[in-house]
Amino acid sequence: MKRVFLIVLDSFGIGEMPDAAAYGDINVNTLGSVSKSPFFHMENMKNMGLFNIDGVEVGEKTDHPTAAYTRMTERSRGKDTTIGHWEIAGIYSPKPLPTYPDGFPEDVLEEFRIRTGRDVLCNKPYSGTQVIADYGDEHVRTGKLIVYTSADSVFQIAAHEDVVPVEQLYDYCRIARQILQGEHGVGRVIARPFIGESGHYTRTPRRHDFSLLPPAVTMLDQLKAAGKDVIAVGKIQDIFVGRGITEHVYTSGNAEGIERTLEYLDKDFEGLCFINLVDYDMLYGHRRDVDGYAKALAYFDEKLPEIQAHMKPEDILMITADHGCDPAYTATTGHTREYTPFLMYGAPVTPGNRGTRPTFSDIGATVLDYFGIQPEFEGSSVLKADPS
């Protein structure tokens, strides 16, 4: 029974792409920055071949890699979660999703006010924790919604759970999602509930993403159409708006995501288990916390042998990322335009170097190839590529 476990280490870039400067990113390298932390330890991924990947100049190379290893190029125009995951699944995005460094236009906000019956606060790029510190009191006093964005293509709505019940906040996000289409089709509308008293507001785990519907067929659609199981762990369900997915489970962070992965390794199914581990990006990358990022990578690396021990003879483990988020890059707090790693491990895989690939979509093509499915998108399998 063939199974693929595809794990996305959210934001784990391995060095700037040639066009990074066009995205405002100069000398960015998530792996390079994190490797300088005293908490950096990736012995198991080293054994797989992480430091043997083209262009990786940190860490110790291994003479006997246990996995196939590849440097992946993002072909799409962008560096965000949505576009990165879409490309992994086969969608090329020739234009970046819209961003709003000066806030959202008045016509968008006016329609939002009319349809929700609530006014808005802020309307500018802001740190998620700082925005509730700065606007939380006024929100609690007036009931106005805190609307803000970031360097990414997002429309975020923060509201205190005692002022706006979470389900109502989700309804407001659905309204925003309906409004934000076409020219203003942001990648994600995000609910950001919070609790607490003045001066001590904290965000709750009940965040929810309302993504743009994928504009073309994906690897997930093809697997589901072929009768395979497509299991989503973490925010994969939201990124693809449930399309092409047969079962999903949300997680509260990396530790739970890894535990859910171990549980699915022990279940019987045929198809794909697609996992997103978000803490690298959400807790450490954007917050520019090098040591926190390093510790989170070390934790995953420590769990790798357990994951591998639960694999069956026809299982393939794939590890990659969707973009970079260099925690040492201080010009912005946003994502960084980087190459990503791709490690492929299991009995059906011949270890070795697969070079540098021209698109993340080669990952989707590789998954489909393993199940004998011809991709309905541009992408080439590296499953049978000659290792060098």
Give the role of each language-model region.
Residues 1-388:
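Feature captures the catalytic ectodomains and active-site-proximal regions of enzymes
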